[in-house]
Amino acid sequence: MRFEGKVAIITGAGRGIGKAIAERLASEGADVVICDVDKEAAERTAEEIRSKYSVKAIAISADVANEGDVNSMVEETIKNFGRVDFLINNAGITRDSLLLRMSEEEWDKVIAVDLKSVFLCTRAVIRHMMRQRFGRIVNISSVIGLRGNVGQANYASAKAGIIGFTKSAARELAGRNITVNAVAPGYIQTEMTERLPQEVKEEMLKQVPLGRPGLPDDVAGVVAFLCSEDASYITGEIIRVDGGMAM
């Protein structure tokens, strides 16, 4: 069990990609903190993990765009486990609209949840990682942050911002044996994408050379690799998990 004795915080882990990441890390021995604004979803995920794996899993309801909530989340983690080794900044939302119609609230909300949260969570954990002289931070960006998308100026800006943040943080923290990397998923089959109109899904699939949507487990496997010793000499990287979509 390569992550035995390690503690991971995963934001937005109540469902979808975040849940898959939490399950993957737990399956390899990590104790996990399931953070989600949806308290019931977080508790369900934590309960499922405890029933399947011989690890500890706690659920914390938090708004990761709120500094107080984030600091409390990290304090609760330290209180329960005494350390934090992995931070997976996965929480994110969309509020799609053409620029001409996009409201300031739609812009601000996406930037806060998708980008500001990455700053707040990272800042809150690094003092503990510095003390340990060890840490792995993985930020979930998107291919939309690399190529843009009609109707998603807010989301694309937030996800592009994560890429710049990842590279800057990687430079700042490397001397403390803390790596910071990002994963940029493409079209991944989740509850959110399943709600899209069929014609939209078909159009997205045409852009994927591998000819299929990705699965949350595809992303989780790359995150687990970046947390492992196999990736100890990798930092500041942006790894696309997109079936070739953004080649």
What residue ranges belong to the model's regions?
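Active-site helix of classical SDR
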Residues: 122, 158, 166
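Residue(s) in the substrate-gating loop at a strand-loop-helix junction
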Residues: 142
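Canonical Rossmann dinucleotide-binding motif of NAD(H)/NADP(H)-dependent dehydrogenases/reductases
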Residues: 2-33, 169
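The beta1-alpha1 cofactor-binding region of Rossmann-like NAD(H)/NADP(H)-dependent oxidoreductases
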Residues: 39-40, 61-72, 104, 218
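Alpha-helical segment proximal to the catalytic Tyr-Lys
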Residues: 127, 171-175, 232
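Substrate-binding pocket helix/loop in short-chain dehydrogenase/reductase
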Residues: 98-99, 106-111, 193, 204
